[in-house]
């Protein structure tokens, strides 16, 4: 069973989003996503300063099994990327909720409310079978 922290919000496409005290939003992939991918070997992150729309492709995660697109769960400007993942992409497998991908300055913070809570995300994962 996947770990699904209650304090996060989730996209159907398996990204998580965390609202920070400064109003920024940190984004990563869920435990379920990293389990499905297997051993992560490469991560392509968005460029700093890029403006993303909710649901827009933001990067790619490559594992020994497959390559999977990463989507921005909300719209906003990329204000930070986790450069450590370039050297140690496997950190995502070890702790997907510490190994964030990028941070956004949200264009509309209310978009967070449209994401799934932990129970909703668990139901979506269960529905996938």
Swiss-Prot record:
Residues 24-105 form the Lipoyl-binding domain. Keywords: Lipoyl. GO terms for biological process: glycine decarboxylation via glycine cleavage system. The keyword Nucleotide-binding does not apply. Pfam families: GCV_H. Binds 1 lipoyl cofactor covalently. The keyword Iron-sulfur does not apply. Its cofactor is (R)-lipoate. The modification N6-lipoyllysine is found at residue 65. InterPro entries: 2-oxoA_DH_lipoyl-BS, Biotin_lipoyl, GCV_H, GCV_H/Fam206, GCV_H_sub, Single_hybrid_motif. One of its GO terms (cellular component) is glycine cleavage complex. Belongs to the GcvH family. The glycine cleavage system catalyzes the degradation of glycine. The H protein shuttles the methylamine group of glycine from the P protein to the T protein. The glycine cleavage system is composed of four proteins: P, T, L and H. NCBIfam families: gcvH, PRK01202.1. This is Glycine cleavage system H protein 2. The lineage of its organism: Bacteria, Pseudomonadati, Pseudomonadota, Gammaproteobacteria, Pseudomonadales. The gene is gcvH2.
């Amino acid at each position: 069973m996947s770990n699904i922290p209650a304090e996060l919000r989730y996209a159907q496409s398996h990204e998580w989003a965390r609202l920070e005290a400064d109003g920024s939003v940190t984004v990563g992939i869920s435990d379920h996503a990293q389990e499905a991918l297997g051993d992560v070997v490469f991560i392509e992150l968005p460029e700093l300063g890029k403006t993303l729309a909710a649901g827009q492709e933001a990067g790619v995660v490559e594992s020994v099994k497959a390559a999977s697109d990463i989507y921005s769960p909300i719209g906003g400007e990329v204000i930070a990327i986790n450069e450590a993942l370039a050297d140690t992409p496997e950190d995502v497998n070890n702790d997907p909720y510490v190994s964030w991908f990028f941070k956004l300055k949200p264009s509309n913070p209310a978009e967070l409310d449209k994401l799934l809570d932990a129970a909703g995300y668990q139901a979506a994962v269960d529905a996938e079978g």
